[in-house]
A protein has these predicted regions:
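Conserved catalytic core of sirtuin-type NAD+-dependent deacylases
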Residues: 1-172
Length: 172
């Protein structure tokens, strides 16, 4: 840690690359550890349930799993998120590049965040493009088949996250 602090103090153009390990202290499990999603038992493997094909062919089951396992309630930014936001305010950190989909970097105050795999906080209609908050996905769980549908056109409202079999957003 002292060496890391020395490097931080000596440099002004830092970019942080991070993933699931950053948010585990906030109570968000990663995918691959012993307690992670991939080691839990489900009807299908998590990689299957989080694939584009599964989303298309088993939409209601996809959303049930998504609501239960990927939307996190009550998670707060931890010391790492807060330290990165502070470094950005100080002008040392130029960007955070993350694979996390939890929005905790922004909740901590980071402004320049590139979410390679998207965010559970953003959701959009696959037909008309209208955006919806995560609460819309949650509330749809208690209605009909549980599939969130656009209030304007009836299209499916999909989480703005990268599923298996999908490419990364080129804008990111």
């Amino acid at each position: 840690v002292p060496e890391l602090e020395r490097l931080i103090q000596a440099h002004q153009n830092i970019v942080f690359f991070g993933g699931a390990g950053v948010s585990t202290e906030s109570g968000i499990p990663d995918f691959r550890s012993v307690d992670g999603l991939y080691h839990q038992k489900f009807k299908y493997p998590p990689e299957t349930m989080l694939s584009h094909t599964f989303y298309e062919q088993h939409t209601a089951e996809f959303f049930d799993f998504y609501r239960q396992k990927l939307i996190v309630h009550g998670a707060k930014p931890n010391a790492a998120h807060l330290r990165l936001a502070k470094l950005e305010r100080e002008g040392k950190l130029k960007a955070v590049v993350t694979q996390n989909i939890d929005g905790l970097h922004q909740a901590a105050g980071s402004k320049t965040v590139y979410e390679l795999h998207g965010s559970t906080l953003r959701n959009y209609c696959t037909r008309c493009g209208k955006f919806y908050p995560v609460s819309f996905i949650e509330e749809a769980g208690g209605k009909g088949d549980g599939v969130p549908r656009c209030t304007d056109c009836g299209g499916i409202v999909k989480p703005d996250v990268v599923l298996y079999e999908e490419g990364l957003d080129e804008a990111t």
